[in-house]
Regions:
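Terminal targeting/low-complexity segments that flank the catalytic cores of oxidoreductases
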Residues: 1-29
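Short, contiguous alpha-helical
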Residues: 2-13, 47-91, 117-128, 132-169
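Cytochrome P450 catalytic-domain "roof"
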Residues: 40-48
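A generic "alpha-helical surface" signal
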Residues: 21, 25-28, 58, 62, ...
Length: 169
């Protein structure tokens, strides 16, 4: 019985190493691929809507910084708990309250890139035993901590693609 338990722990560690290394490496590639194109955007261009009727690049990047901040807390708190509930996320309210549209574009790019590089570090070190911790965010269906990390990268790529920033190097 103890031997099977050890085999299970070994499998979980191997799964974690592959899964979280894949997620963190994907995030790192996205940041590396997107940072230079983001830095090439002028202050003026960053304030214009990327798509007709949509948010400006500043607002999108501000949202992604806020997403990094929210998910950082989710990753760390879930890794310290057996289950966790988080409040719903008010995207438009958050962008408005933080006055992202009046922030300097280079500062936003610096913060976005640095915060996401730190999240690469955090994701790589999430404990294997905590990847299945159940997380509830607002009224959404419960998901695992591992899923949150994977979905964070998908969300980031989606928004960068929407503002015309290539995420593949």
């Amino acid at each position: 019985m103890a031997e099977r338990e050890e085999e299970g722990k070994l499998y979980l560690r191997m799964y974690h190493d592959v899964c979280m290394e894949h997620v963190s490496a994907a995030l790192e590639r996205v940041v590396d691929a997107a940072e230079i194109p983001l830095r090439r955007v002028s202050e003026e261009e960053s304030g214009r809507p990327a798509l007709p009727g949509g948010w400006s690049r500043k607002q999108v990047l501000g949202h992604l910084i806020d997403s990094a901040s929210n998910n950082h807390q989710r990753f760390v708190r879930a890794a310290l708990a057996d289950a966790l509930e988080f409040p719903a996320y008010d995207t438009p309210g958050s962008v408005r309250v933080q006055a992202v549209a009046s922030a300097a574009w280079p500062m936003l790019v610096d913060l976005w890139a640095s915060y996401n590089r730190y999240l690469v570090h955090v994701i790589r070190r999430l404990p294997a035993a905590k990847l299945e911790v159940v997380c509830r965010i607002g009224s959404n269906a419960p998901v695992s901590l591992g899923y949150l990390a994977e979905d964070y990268v998908r969300h980031l790529v989606h928004h960068l693609d929407r503002i015309g920033v290539a995420t593949r190097s």
